């Protein structure tokens, strides 16, 4: 069993025209990740052989967030009802939970997860499978922190060496039902609201497909 995590506090002040200052972010995050290898080198729990199944592990990631800006920031706390503040300042969720298995030359990851294709620092070219949560400080956060994990199946076929290529593989992703759009807010009362008037409608829910 492997367990790791972190506790993080982020505080940001805004100074309009360099006169005065007000809090626009005071976000406190705690995350814990547990990984259990119940099958290694073809042996489950150290004694049970499962044939061609070589490796298997279960990963669970949980996250809790408290954004106290809705309590200590007068510019925002006075604009919301108690019920609205409770909804916005707390977030508790099972962020990711997935099963990894390896049956060489195939490997599978099944569950709620992030899939990254061609990650870059400032824009997403191929890394568009998971939607984004852009409701808070989205311009300065890592993609990993603001991606929304989805329930899906990820499969990789390891081809190995082909000519000058030392490693090559084929990857497929199947999202059977978990369609979510990126989350943004245009509510001017919120500190990270986007420009009002942006269309946020999705015309059609896409069908289940393989990429």
Cite the ranges covered by each PLM segment.
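Short loop/turn motifs that connect adjacent beta-strands in outer-membrane beta-barrel proteins
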Residues: 1-3, 35-58, 102-106, 121, ...
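Surface-exposed loop and membrane-interface regions of Gram-negative outer-membrane beta-barrel proteins
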Residues: 24, 44-101, 122-123
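Signature for the C-terminal beta-barrel architecture of outer-membrane proteins
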Residues: 143-211
């Amino acid at each position: 069993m492997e367990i790791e995590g972190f506790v993080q506090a982020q505080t940001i002040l805004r100074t309009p025209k360099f006169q005065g200052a007000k809090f626009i972010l005071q976000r406190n995050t705690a995350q814990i990740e547990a990984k259990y290898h119940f099958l290694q080198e073809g042996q489950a729990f150290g004694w049970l052989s499962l044939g061609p199944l070589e490796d298997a592990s279960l990963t669970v990631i949980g996250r809790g967030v408290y954004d106290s800006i809705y309590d200590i920031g007068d510019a925002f706390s006075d604009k919301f009802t108690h019920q609205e503040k409770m909804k916005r300042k707390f977030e508790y969720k099972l962020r990711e939970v997935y099963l990894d298995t390896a049956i060489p030359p195939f490997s599978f990851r099944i569950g709620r997860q992030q899939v990254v294709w061609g990650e870059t620092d400032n824009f997403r070219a191929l890394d568009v499978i998971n939607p984004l949560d852009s409701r808070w400080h989205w311009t300065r956060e890592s993609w990993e922190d603001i991606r929304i994990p989805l329930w899906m199946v990820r499969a990789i076929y390891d081809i190995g060496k082909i000519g000058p290529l030392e490693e090559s593989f084929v990857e497929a992703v199947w999202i059977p039902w978990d369609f979510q759009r990126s989350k943004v807010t245009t509510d001017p009362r919120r500190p990270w609201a986007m420009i009002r008037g942006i269309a946020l409608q999705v015309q059609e829910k896409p069908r289940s497909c393989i990429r």
